[in-house]
Structure formats: C-alpha cells, structure tokens
Swiss-Prot record:
GO cellular component: chloroplast inner membrane
Protein name: Protein TIC 214
Function comment: Involved in protein precursor import into chloroplasts. May be part of an intermediate translocation complex acting as a protein-conducting channel at the inner envelope.
Localization of this protein: Plastid, Chloroplast inner membrane
Gene source species: Cuscuta exaltata
Entry similarity comment: Belongs to the TIC214 family.
Transmembrane portions of the chain: 25-45, 53-73, 94-116, 133-153, 172-192
Biased composition, class Basic and acidic residues, residue ranges: 1386-1395
Highest rank taxon of the organism: Eukaryota
Subunit structure: Part of the Tic complex.
Statement: the UniProt record of this protein carries the keyword Plastid: yes
Length: 1634
C-alpha cells in the first residue's frame, strides 16, 4: 500500500509540474504578446532596470541550482501546491524565461513591424482579436507537437534503453550537459551585468539653476574689476526659467513616485556621450527616430510617408485639440486639393499638344520660320477668397531661390499693406504688431480655469517714450571716427538681419527637448574664478601639467637677496603675481578611450568592432576597415605573386602599377623620413609613460649619465690624448681642450624638451619626466684646427645610455671618429707615394705590352703557316686553280691580320713618342693611366698572393736551404774524414766514385747562384766539346718564358723533329712535348697524322727547369751510353716532372694564380664523368681494357715507364689511385673526407730513424739497362708499429701482399718528388729542427693533391723480401705468369707458418682490422671535452717509445684526467674490457660493389697509364693483345682508353675517316727492338677493330647525346661534368656479332 501511495504521489507531482510549466509558459507568452501592442509595457520590459530585477536573479538562481541542488532541497509533506517550492520554481522558470526573450535576444524590428501592421489595419479591434486567437492556436499546436514527439520517444523502447544506457548511466554526459548549461548561464549573466546600470545612486546632476548662479557671480566679479567698461548684465529670459519651474511644480504626484523611476526618461545615470553646447542652454535630447512615419496629402490623396518628421505630427495633434475650440463653424477643408489635380491635367494636355506640334513641324519640307516657345516655371502663389492668385516675389519664392522656413504675413499688418524698406523707423514703431495666434494657442492651457476668459482678449499696450530713448541712445555717436564711418560706409539694403528686424517674418520655431542639467569638463572646472564646482562631469583627456614659471619661488629668491626693509607695495604685487603660474599641459600620444565620456554612464556593448590582431591599440569600425594599412593587402600580395610566378603573366599589371606610381622627390623622401622618426620618438616616449616607476628610473639614469660624462669620461679623454701627444714628442693641448670642456653646459628640460635652467629642476620631474640638453657638446680631436662650428652640432640631448641625440627620444647620432683626420692624412701620403711608384712602373708596362704584341704576331704567323701545311694534303682531289685561289685567300687574310696587329702595336708604342706639349698626348696618357690603375686595382689581390708566395720562397725556403746545406756539408766532411782514416786510399777513391754515381742530391733552381754546387755545375758548361742538344735546350729554357713557348712551337714542326737526336726525343717525349708517333713517324705518310696535329694544337705542355737541370748534369753519362735502352740508375726523370713547385707553368702564369681546390674539384668531376662514360662503353665487357702497344723486353723487377705528363685540365684525366685490395673493394670515391684538400700532417707521425720500404715511391724509366740494379733504400716516413706493442687503439691498415711486393720496383707514382731527397737523407737528429721534408712534401702535394701513391697511408706490415733480379727469363708472358703464381703460393705458405705462432687474441684483432678500415665509438655516457682529450693523449702515447716520461709530464701539466682512467686493480682482456666498459668501438664496413670487379681498377689504370703503362698486378695479370704486324708496321695506341672523355668524341670523328691509313706508322719506334716479346691475337684483328669501332664511336656517341639532353632538361646545366648525377641507362649496349 505504501508503494502505491508513493506512486500516486509521484504521478500527482508530475502532473502538477506539467500544469505549472504550461501555465507559466502561456502566461509569459501572453504578456509578451500584449507588450507588442502596448508600447509602455514593451518599453518597460526592455529597460535596463528590468534586467536588473528579473534577468540577473533568474540567471544566478539557475546557476546555483545546477551546481548545487542541495541548496534548494526542501522536504515538505504539505499538499498545498503553492507552498511547494519546486512547483513554484517551475512556474517562475517558464514565466520569466518568456519575459526575458526580448532582453536576452533583443529584436528591434519586431516593434516596428507591429506598429506598421496596427497602422495599416482600419479595424484595430478585429486585428487584435484575430491575432490573439492565431497566437493561441499556434501555442497549443506547438505544445501538442512537442508532446507527441516525446510520447513517441517513450513508446520506442530501444530509444529509451539507449538513452538510459549511454546517457543517463554514463555520468560524463550528465556532467558535460550541466557544465555547458551552467557556463552558458554564467556568460549570459555577465553580459547582462555589463548592460545593466548600477543600482547604487550616483552623484547629483549639476542643475541649471546652479550653473546660472555661477555665471552671474562671475559676471558680477568682472563688472567690479572693470569699472570703466560698463557691460550690460546678460540674463536668461524669464520665460525659460519660469517654464521649467512651473513644469516642476505642476508635475503630478504619480510621476514623482519611486516606482516611476524605473521608467523615467532621465534615468538614474547619464547618457554615454554629451552634446556640448557653448551657450547657456542645456544639451539637446536626441530622441528622434528616422523610422517614424505618418500620413500627408499629396495630389489630393492621403499617402504614407516613412520619413515624416515627428515634430510635425505632434504639432498637428496639438492643433487638432485646440482649433475646434476657436473655429467650430469651419471645417478642415483644403481647397488646393482639387486645383492640384486639375493643374496636373492641364499640364499633361499642354505637353501632348506641344509634342504633336513639334512632330508636325518636322514632317514639313518647307523651311519654317523661327518658332519662339515660352518657358514655363512653377511659381508659388497666395490664394485667398478675397484676393486672386498673387505670385510671391522672386527673392522669397522657394521654388526659384531655394527653401525658406517662413512666410510673409502681410494680412497681419494693420496700418499699411505697402510698406517698403525705405520707410522711416519711427513709422514702424508707431504701429502695433499683432501677436501670432498659433503662439497663443500653444501657450494656452486648456486645463486652466481662465482659458475661456483669455480666449479673445489680447493685451495691447501703447508705446512709451522710453522706447524711443533706447533708440536714440543707440544712435549717439560721440567719437569722430564713428561719425565718419557712419556717413561714409555704404548701407546694405539687402541685409538679412535688417530684414528680420523690421519686416514681420514669423519663423516656425520649436523648443527642442533638452536635458535639465548641464555638464562641465575639467578645463571648465579650472576656469571658474570663484566657487568652482566640486567635481567635473565629463572626462577630459589625460594630461600632465608642467609648471614653466612660478612667480612665488622667484619672489622668495629676490626677497632673500634684497634687504628686508622694502615697501609693502612690493609684497602686495608679489601676492598678486603668486596666482599667475604659467602651466603647460602635456598630453601623451597614446589613445584615450575615456575621453569625452560622462562619469558613471552606462557603457555600450561594442558588437560591431573589427579586431584585426590579438591586441589592438586603437578600435576600428568595419566602415573604415578599408582605410587601414593591412599587412596582407591586395597590392602587396600581387607584388609577391608577381615575383613568384612567371613575369609575362602579370606584365601588364606591373606596367600599369609602375605608370601610376608617382615619382618621389628628395623632399618627399625627407618628409617621410622625418615623419617616421617622429613616430618612433613618440612611441618611445609613450613607452616610458606606461609604467609607473619608469620616469623615476629614467630621470636618475640621465642625471648619473650627465655626471659621468662631465666629470669622469671627458677629463679622462683629455688626459689620455695629451699624454699621447707628449709621448709622440708633440705639443700638448691642455688649454684648448679644457676651454671646450668648460664650454659644454647641461640644462634641465621638461619632458617635451623645453629648457628651464641649468640648476633648477622642473616640478614633479620624477613622475612627469625630464630631459637633459647639452649646449656646445665636447668633441675630442687629435689636433685643433680652425673650423667654423655648424649650428647642427651646437646642442644635443642626452640619452639613458649616455649618447647624443638631436631630438628627445631620437636616434643616437654618429660622433666623429678620433683617428679620422689622422687616417685622412695617411691616405693623402699613400696616394702621393702610389703616384710616384706608378709613374715609374708605367714605362715598364708599355714595354711589356709591346713585347707581348710581338710575340702574338709571331705565334699567329707560325700557327697559320702550320695550318696551311696541314691542310694542303686535303686538296689533292681539287684542281690546280682552286688550290691557287685558296693559297691566295689565305695569304691575304694573314697579311690583313699582320697589318691589324702592327697597327695595334703602334697605338700602344707610339704614345711614348708623342710630344708632351700636345693635348692629345695628355688625354691619351690620362686614359692609359686610368686603365692601368683599374687593372692594378682589379689585380691587387693577385699581387698580394704573389707577394706572399715570393716572401715564402725567398726567405723561408732560403733559410731552410742554407741550414740544410750546412748540415749536409758538415756530415759529408765528417764521413770523408772517417773513411779516409779507416780504409786505404784506393778503396776510398772507389767509394767516392760510387757515391757520386748513386747519390741523389736535391737539386734546386735557387736564385742563390753563388753557392758552391751551382758553381761546379756551371763550370762544366765551359767545355764546348761536351756540349750536346740537351745542354742547348737547357740554355734556351733559361732565357725566359717567351722563348720556351717559341721552342715548343718550333719543336712541334714535322720537319724539325727529324734533326733532333733520338735520346733527346725520348727524354722530351717523357715531358709530353713529343709523342712516340710524332717522333718516329715516316716522312712520306703525313696524311695519316691529322689527329696528331689536333693533339698538338689542343695540348699544353709543362717543361720544368729542374728537368733540364738534371739533363745538363748528366750530359757526360749520356754520351757513354751503350744501348738506347740504357738508363742511369740514379736519375729518375719522372720525379722532376712530378714536382709542381718549380714547373715552368708557374713562371709562365704568374699573374693567374691557380686554386688547388678548383683543381681538386675539376679532377673529381672529370673522374666521375669518365666512370659513367666507361660504364656506358664497356658495360658487357668483363675483361681489362684493350691496349695496343709494343712491349719491350725488360728485366725481372723492372717497370716500363712511359710519361705523358699532361695537365689534367686539357687532355689527360688523372684520377686517384686506390689503395688496398682491388679485387675485394670497388669504391668509386669515398665521400667521407671530400673537403680535405691537402694531407693533414697531424694525423701521421714522421720519423726517419726507422726504415721502411719506399721502393713504391721510385719510378723507373722505359729505357733501363739490363745490368742496372736497383737497391732498397729503406727509410721510414711513418712510424712502424711493432706487433708486440699492438693494443686496443693501434690500427694497422693491411695491404695485399700479393699485389705489391716490398722488393718490387713496380711503382706507379713518384709521390711528391721526394725520393731523391729522402733516399740520400742522413740519419741525424737535426731533421726535426728544420723540417725540410715537410716543406718539400707539402709544396709538391699542394700542386697535385689528387695523386696518391699506392703505399703512402699504409703502415709497414713486415713483409718478406724477394730478390729483385732472377736468373731465368722466359720468352713468353704465359711462362712468367705461371712463375708469378708459384711465387705467390710460396709467399702465402710462409705467411701461414708465421701466423701460426701468433696468439688467438692478436689474430682476431688483426682479422678485425683487416676486414674493416673505419671505426666509430659509442658509449652509454655523455662524453665531455676532457674525455676526448684523454683519448687523443692515449693515442699519442701509444706511438711513443718513452711513454712513462710523457705520461708523467701530462699528469703534471694536468692534461690527463685520472678520474676518467679505469682502475688497474682488475686486469682484463680486451673482450672482457669491452663488455664491462661503456665505451665500444663499432666497425663501419666500407661500401663493396659486387657488379664489375675490375671496373675501378680499369679506370684508375687508364688515368694513370702514363705512369704505369705496362705494369700490372701480379695476381691478376692479363695478356696484352697485340695486333698483327705486317711489313714492319705496328698499330698505334688506342687513345679511347688514354684520353679524357671530353676529348674522345672529337677524336673519334677525326679517326673514323682516316681508319684505313693506320698501317702508315713507322715501325722504328723506341719501344720496338730485338728484345721485344710480341703476343699474337688468336682472332682476326680486323674483325675486332670493326667491333671496337662500332662500340666505342657510334653507339656511345648517340648514347651520351641522350644523356646530355636529359641533363640539360632536368638539371638546367650544359656542363658535361654533371653526368655523374645520372645513374640510369637509356638503352642497353648492342651486341654486334661478326
């Protein structure tokens, strides 16, 4: 039963809540509906005080209700529903929410629409009833529809289940819903709080009576002061004050009730803005609306006007109430209505007739006379019953002259209707003016009792004599000046003021609604002399008053100085002056939004303000948004888009913009700069005003800066300058500097920069700010010279940082530099010295130019003659006449060129012989001097580099050379003395002879020709019987650069080469001047050498003077040569040519210094391009490159040398040699240290005490003697790491023992040209003093950084030695290969026996280091700099012998950190150490390519073919394929594998047309002899040649062209070196069978 009762109670409560909600909703909607039709209720609901009473409590209650429901928990067991708080809250909730609909969501158009509908409906009661029923039906329909939807949801169980399961049970949704609803209510409550006025009563308004009283008191005080000047007392008319008092007294009691304060138009608070009125009247109340509408008659019909003035409608309503009382018998009828319609009809008929007449006249063919049409104008007329229509005068007709608010009332004048302006004033004054009836009607109060009595009675007072007295008093002219002005000046007849006074024109006036109070500003409050108001009402702009002049302080100072006995009159004067203070108001530039606002006024909600940024200093309206300077404006975006996109698309827009842009003059630019600077200064000043304590800090800083400047800095500068002058033996300038220092004065100024005085501070300077102005600022100068000081530098302002500015808060100006005049004097002297030097150098430069012109003429003649000789054989098929023509044309062209070059030479040389008195000479000389100066300025950097290089060569190397020679002579003398004392005389003589033959001294072309060795070598040249062609060549080479070039051009001639000795040809051939084909070619086959001529023209040759010096030193030995294959054992000609320091090209190109980095980059690019081209050519060819060359028979262990030493930039591409195992590793280039240009000597520790094999450094010539033996000159450049001392950080890089034997002299490169220097180097301790080998190696390595020897960076591996010569020699190369394989097997067996003795740990470490070359360190800790420093010191200690001493010294110097070092208590093995410690070395395996095992080896061999022509690795020796020899003819070398890839295409085109003439080469080559072993090819050589021709010329030609096109398209380059980027293949190479 209890459960049933609870259920029934719950159902009853739910029904009661539903009923309460529906009733509250309907009642609220009903009141809202009534408020639409009843204006007072609508206004009451929209007032801000209703928001304070209804909205704010409602929202706050809901906010607390949703947050804490226990606050409203109320358990009541009573059945009365009214007392139940929940039901009443539901009712109020729905009721108040409907009333607040207009407050929360206000809609201004709703009220306007309702009033329009009410106005349009004639039957308003029917409209109200119909609209009410429609509203009621709509409300019911809406409620029912909501109920149906809710019932349908309840019936659907799955919707209820989902709602309960997911929403109600899940507390997150409930919390979110409550939070959202609560936050929304909170936002609405805050918005309402911003809109509502504060219910606290504010200060009382300044009423009009108080203002009038203050004004009267002020005027009375002025009259008392100025007694002489009598002024009338200005009083307000009694009418306005009486009306206001009457209105206040007659207001009903209902309006004074407290409840009416909510709806009072005056409000509790004041309006937002105040319309200031300069008169004594109050401010207007702006309550007119532009949307007011009313009816008016137009064309006899009532029409609706939406812009009808509200004042006119109110006036008509007032008239309707009062006119029936006056004129009851008359009805309101407008007789002009019918006339308006009839007049419009007449106008239409007249226009129709007029148009028809014009059309008829146009149709007539006869010439009509001139028709005069009358012009009609609408005029305003007066229409009465008594008088007919009379037009107004033109001056007063508004249809002609414009609108006039007034009308002439002639009927109201009683005496005479035709009064004119010329009538006398007395006649006007006699007549009485009838009062305006409308005015009387408006003033009448219908509610008063005396209304009927005053209906028709108008008071008429007669004129009095006093009126005329006032007129006569006004016309009294006492001054003679006034009389003359009154008589002479003309009188204006059309004066509007005169017309207004004496012509009775009544204007329609209306007393506008005004506020009952008058507000004042702060300035008006200050302006009151007596009884000023307590506070101002309107906020004025924030300003700071700065007192400029205070007479009280000056009076106090004057009184203290003067005697005390003075008159009291002075004291009274001082008192009167004490009130007169000069004050200047300083306004900040920052925006003040409170300016002009009324205190305690309600702020408006700024809904239509556009916010551009996060913080806006100024508020902008959307109306003026287009005038703002926006960052992302259209013209700026267009400019950016033009720069990014194609120029031709927006070319028209850009051109139009340029045309429309105005050219800025210098004045405009200066003005813009000034405005910009002024803006910046104002911003800085405002920044100091923002913070409260900023002005105090700034003022104190300025005072400290002025004290430091005046008392510390400037005296110290003066002291330092004069002490310096005394030290430089110059006269000090104490008096001048002190005079200028005393002249500088610091004046305190206001914040705006107005100067006050030197000692006094402005008032409130700590809060308002201060400036310090410096008059005649001190400027330190090195010496005093008379210069008039400009006014620009007479004053400045001091900044916070102690610098000078021209204006307050301006940019600091540049102070003159102290050493500027000193530098100017030095510049003048330097210019004079340069002029003297250049005048001397001028003549030498002219001479050089003349010599160069001579050389160019001769060289061009020689080249032209050679071209003629070369091109003659091509004309064999032509006729004799054509040959003669060609010859004549060529001779003409050569003659013309010679003439031009001689004229150019004359232009240069004849300028020296022109007379100095001619003007042309002076002009030409000035032009040449200017050109020379420009060239010298351009080449100044090159001159500087050459100067540094000369200093290095002449001083540093000179000292090294002297020290080395002295030590060498000393050691040689000691050796000779010891050898003489020990051995016998005969053995000593033999030893000396042997030493002379085997010794390799370092030969320098030094400039010190006075040395002993140079004298000995030069004395040998006096014997003319010993002269040879080599000595002649050497002497010619010593004459100069130009003669060497001539020598090359002469030697390259085909005829002269036959008269040179064969030995000289071989030696010159090694330097690249001659090729083997050119030297030993047949004379009767010149047409087979077209490509040789091309090579000769395109190649540049380097002839080193050291090379020729070696030739002349060995001229005796060359004459005693037995066979032509003999080669002196000591001298290796390659090393002189590889030396790049003393090459002839360095002397030839002194003005064009080379950059080693460019050479390295070019070599790398060339190498990459060669690799790509070689891959494309020999893609399927797995064997080595085919080389066609004669192989001479050589001894075992001797290399065949062939030197084609050409510069890598011209013909031959020199690529780096790759160390290590070539079979195992295939690395095109390791990109780890690409930026390293030179060898880093810090990475290698040099010592010459130990020995290591350096036979790989020594190069052997092709013409070597059988009996010549090459010894092992074992000196070590790199420290050897013993196997016993190998530890964790030792890193030996192993090489393949089978490829490079230690005893084999198969060297590829004479590295750095330092073999002779190091082989004959004595083992002494003096080498570390001078480091001669460092200088030598470094200089040579700089010239050719890309050439690396095969064993320079490989540590010694203690390889076993093999004898250099063997007894048995084989006749074929196959037998030698078998023997080499057997030797390698033996060597491997020996290595295996040695390796068995090693420990297991050492073997693992060696295998680890053999497999990997690079390591990286990783650890579990962050490494500091000290940790890496310790590692560097450990590595250094591992290389040293005396480690203990070095460790102790490092510990003493605190370079080793003992905390980082591990403790030595537990000795661990290497693997255990690596496991336990955090530092681990991880190997980095090198990149290994499996495709193409010999690809890299082939490329390197091709690029170094001039170094190792016939040398191959012993393990991978390949048979050389030699073509068939027929009739002692041998094919030449295939240049496809020698030349650089850039020259191959041009060479193929020349060879392909001369392919059949290859058999015309001479067989008497230096490489062909009886001792040569020839290897025959098993296949037919001609078929192979065809295949190679097609593969190497035709197919790669097209293929590389495709790659070039792709390269240009994809990478926008035309350089062939970029081909290394393209790693893809367009086509596969074709297989040609045949």
């Amino acid at each position: 039963m209890e459960k049933k009762t609870n259920k029934n109670k719950g159902v009853a409560e739910e029904t009661k809540k539903k009923v309460a909600a529906t009733t509250g909703f309907i009642i609220g909607q009903f009141i809202r509906f009534i408020s639409i039709y009843y204006a007072p209720l609508y206004v009451a609901l929209g007032r801000p005080h209703t928001i304070t009473i209804l909205a704010l409590p409602y929202l706050l209650i809901h906010l607390f209700w949703n947050t804490d429901k226990s606050f409203f928990a109320y358990d009541s067991k009573k059945l009365n529903s009214i007392r139940n708080l929940e039901i009443s809250s539901v009712f109020l909730n729905h009721f108040i929410l409907q009333l607040l609909n207009s407050c929360i969501l206000p809609n201004s158009t709703l009220a306007r629409l309702i009033t329009i509908y009410m106005f349009r409906c004639n039957n308003k009661i029917l409209f109200l009833t119909s609209s009410f029923f429609a509203w009621f039906i709509g409300q019911i329909f809406m409620l029912n529809s909501f109920e149906l939807v809710l019932v349908w949801i309840r019936k659907k169980n799955y919707l209820r289940s989902t709602f309960r399961n997911y929403l109600l049970r899940n507390s997150i949704f409930v919390i979110l819903f409550n939070c959202l609803f609560g936050s929304l209510l909170f936002i609405l409550s805050i918005q309402c709080l911003g809109r509502i006025p504060s219910p606290i009563p504010t200060q009382k308004l300044s009423e009009v009576s108080k203002i009038e009283q203050r004004e009267r008191e002020r005027l009375q005080s002025e009259e008392e002061r100025d007694v002489e000047k009598k002024k009338p007392d200005y009083k307000l008319p009694d009418s306005e004050s009486e009306i206001l008092q009457k209105n206040e007294s007659e207001t009903p009691e209902f309006e004074k009730h407290l409840a009416a304060l909510l709806f009072d138009y005056k409000r509790w608070t004041r309006p937002f803005r105040y319309i200031k009125n300069n008169r004594l009247e109050q401010a207007l109340r702006n309550e007119l609306s532009q949307y007011f509408f009313d009816t008016y008659q137009s064309d006899g019909k009532n029409r609706l006007s939406f812009t009808h003035p509200i004042s006119l409608s109110t006036f008509l309503k007032m008239m309707k109430l009062k006119i029936p009382l006056l004129l009851v018998e008359k009805t309101l009828y407008n007789p002009l209505d019918n006339g308006w319609v009839s007049r419009n009809k007449k106008q239409m008929n007249y226009r129709r007739i007029y148009f028809l007449n014009r059309v008829n006249n146009l149709d007539k063919a006869v010439a009509l006379p001139r028709i005069q049409f009358e012009t009609t104008r609408t005029r305003l007329c007066i229409h009465n019953d008594e008088t007919k229509q009379e037009y107004l005068p033109e001056n007063y007709d508004p249809l002609l002259t414009g609108p006039h608010r007034g009308r002439i009332k002639r009927g109201l004048l009683t005496i005479n209707d035709t009064l004119t302006i010329n009538d006398t004033l007395s006649e006007h004054l006699r007549e009485t003016i009838i009062l305006n009836r409308l005015h009387a009607l408006v003033l009448l109060n219908t509610n008063s009792k005396n209304f009927n009595q005053k209906m028709y009675t108008f008071e008429k007072k007669p004129l009095e004599i006093s009126d005329f007295s006032t007129l006569s008093s006004n016309l009294n002219l006492t001054d003679p000046d006034q009389k003359t002005e009154f008589l002479v000046n003309p009188i204006e007849t059309h004066d509007p003021n005169f017309i207004r006074k004496y012509i009775p024109i009544e204007e329609i006036r209306k007393n506008a609604p005004r506020w009952s109070y008058k507000l004042i500003t702060e300035l008006e409050q200050i302006s009151y002399y007596k009884n000023p108001p307590e506070d101002h009402d309107i906020r004025s702009r924030k300003g700071i008053s700065v007192v400029i002049f205070d007479p009280t302080k000056e009076a106090a100072t004057t009184n203290s100085k003067t005697n005390t006995t003075k008159d009291t009159n002075l004291e009274t004067k001082n008192k009167s002056k004490s009130d007169e203070k000069l004050v200047v108001i300083r306004y900040p530039q920052q925006s003040d939004f409170r300016q002009g606002l009324i205190k305690d006024s309600m702020r408006t909600q700024r809904r239509k303000i556009f916010l551009q940024e996060l913080f806006n200093a100024n508020v902008h309206s959307p109306l003026f948004f287009d005038r703002l300077r926006i960052v992302f404006s259209f013209p700026r975006l267009k400019q950016i888009f033009i720069n990014l996109s194609a120029r031709h698309v927006f070319g028209i827009l850009k051109s139009t913009d340029k045309q429309t842009k105005r050219k800025r003059t210098k004045k405009e630019e200066k003005g813009e700069n000034k405005r910009r600077e002024q803006k910046e200064r104002l911003e800085i000043g405002e920044a100091w005003d923002v913070f409260p304590l900023a002005q105090i800090i700034r003022g104190l800083l300025l005072l400290t800066q002025s004290f430091i400047r005046k008392k510390i800095i400037l005296p110290s500068l003066i002291l330092g300058k004069n002490i310096g002058r005394i030290l430089l033996c110059q006269i000090p300038e104490w008096s001048e500097d002190l005079q200028e220092w005393n002249r500088e004065t610091h004046i305190k100024c206001t914040y705006n920069g107005i100067p006050l005085s030197q000692k006094k501070f402005p008032e409130n300077w700590l809060t308002e700010g201060i400036q310090i102005k410096i008059l005649f600022p001190f400027c330190l100068k090195p010496w005093h010279a008379y210069k008039p000081r400009t006014s620009h530098y007479d004053f400045c302002f001091l900044t916070v940082w102690g610098r000078e500015t021209e204006q307050p808060f301006g940019h600091p100006r540049k102070t003159p530099f102290f050493f500027e005049p000193v530098l100017q004097e030095l510049d003048k002297k330097i210019v004079n010295i340069k002029a003297r030097i250049f005048s001397k150098v001028k003549i030498n430069l002219f001479k050089r130019v003349s010599k160069e012109n001579d050389f160019q003429i001769r060289k061009q003649i020689m080249n032209e003659s050679f071209r003629q000789i070369e091109e003659i054989p091509s004309c064999t098929n032509s006729s004799l006449i054509e040959k003669m023509r060609n010859m004549s044309d060529r001779t003409r062209t050569i003659k013309k060129k010679i003439e031009r070059m001689t004229e150019d030479k004359k232009k240069v040389t004849l300028e020296l012989y022109i007379s100095t008195y001619k003007r042309s000479y002076r002009l030409a000389l000035s032009k040449t001097i200017c050109k020379m100066v420009k060239v010298l300025i351009w080449k100044f950097s090159y001159f500087q580099k050459l100067l540094n290089q000369r200093v290095y060569n002449d001083i540093f190397l000179y000292t090294i050379y002297i020290c080395r020679m002295t030590t060498q002579l000393f050691l040689e003398s000691t050796k000779k003395f010891i050898s003489k004392s020990i051995l016998k005389n005969e053995r000593t003589k033999k030893r000396i002879n042997i030493n002379k033959e085997t010794k390799n001294k370092i030969h320098f072309l030094s400039k010190l020709k006075t040395s002993k060795n140079c004298k000995k070598n030069l004395d040998l040249s006096c014997d003319f019987s010993n002269l040879s062609q080599a000595y002649v060549f050497y002497k010619i080479s010593q004459t100069g650069v130009l003669n060497i070039c001539k020598l090359i051009s002469v030697l390259q001639h085909t005829v002269i080469s036959f008269f040179i000795q064969t030995q000289i040809k071989d030696l010159v051939h090694t330097e690249g001047i001659f090729k083997s084909e050119v030297i030993h070619q047949k004379l009767q086959w010149p047409k087979t050498s077209q490509w040789k001529n091309w090579l000769r023209l395109n190649s540049k040759y380097d002839l080193s003077p050291i090379f020729w010096f070696s030739l002349i030193s060995q001229k005796q030995k060359w004459r005693n040569r037995v066979t032509k294959y003999h080669r002196p054992k000591e001298k290796y000609l390659n090393k002189w040519n590889s030396h790049g320091k003393y090459r002839l090209s360095d002397y030839k190109k002194q003005n064009v210094p080379k950059s080693v980095s460019n050479q390295k980059d070019n070599s790398k690019k060339c190498y990459q391009y060669d690799l790509l081209s070689y891959k494309s050519i020999n893609y399927e060819k797995k064997s080595a490159s085919v080389l066609y060359r004669s192989t001479p028979k050589v001894t075992k262990g001797q290399a065949i040398y062939h030197n084609d030493n050409m510069s890598q930039n011209y013909l031959f591409a020199i690529t780096p040699n790759i160390p290590g195992k070539i079979k195992r590793v295939d690395i095109p280039y390791i990109g780890k240290n690409l930026d390293r240009k030179y060898l880093i000597w810090k990475n290698i520790h040099f010592s010459l005490r130990k020995k290591v094999d350096i036979e790989s450094w020594v190069a052997v010539n092709t013409s070597s003697n059988k009996d010549s033996t090459i010894g092992n000159y074992n000196y070590q450049l790199i420290d050897q790491i013993d196997k016993k001392e190998k530890e964790l950080f030792s890193l030996p890089i192993h090489q393949n023992t089978e490829i490079n034997r230690p005893n084999s002299t198969n060297s590829l490169v004479d590295w750095m040209g330092m073999n002779e220097q190091i082989l004959n180097r004595p083992i002494t301790n003096l080498e570390l003093w001078f480091f001669p080998e460092f200088v030598w190696l470094f200089n040579v390595y700089k010239t050719k950084p890309w050439i690396i020897p095969s064993k320079i960076l490989l540590l010694n591996s203690n390889l076993s030695e093999i004898d250099s010569q063997q007894k048995s020699e084989t006749d074929s190369e196959t037998d030698s290969q078998q023997k080499n394989i057997a030797e390698t097997q033996k060597y491997l067996e020996e290595d295996s026996t040695k390796s068995d003795t090693k420990k297991e740990t050492e073997l693992e470490l060696e295998l680890f280091t053999k497999k990997y070359f690079l390591f990286q360190l990783r650890g579990d800790q962050t490494f500091n700099k000290s940790f890496f420093k310790n590692i560097q010191i450990y590595c250094l200690l591992l290389r040293l012998r005396n480690r203990k001493k070095m460790t102790l010294s490092c510990i003493q110097r605190r370079k080793l950190n003992l905390r980082i070092m591990p403790s030595m208590t537990n000795l661990l093995n290497v693997p255990e150490f690596l496991k336990r410690t955090g530092l681990v070395m991880d190997p980095l395996p090198l990149s290994i390519k499996t495709d193409g095992k010999f690809l890299l080896y082939k490329i390197v061999g091709i690029s170094l073919v001039h170094k190792s022509k016939d040398q191959t690795n012993k393990k991978y020796r390949k048979t050389r394929i030699i073509r068939a020899v027929e009739n002692n003819h041998l094919d030449v070398l295939v240049l496809e594998n020698i030349l650089s890839s850039r020259c191959r295409r041009e060479l193929r085109t020349l060879i392909c047309f001369n392919y059949k003439n290859w058999n015309g080469v001479n067989t008497t080559s230096i490489f062909c002899s009886k001792n040569c072993n020839l290897f025959w090819e098993e296949r037919n050589p001609r078929q192979n040649d065809k295949r190679e021709l097609i593969q190497k010329f035709i197919w790669p030609n097209y293929r590389l062209e495709d790659l070039a096109c792709m390269n240009r398209y994809s990478f926008d380059t035309t350089n062939g070196s970029r081909f290394s980027i393209l790693r893809f293949h367009m086509y596969l190479p074709r297989k040609i069978h045949g």
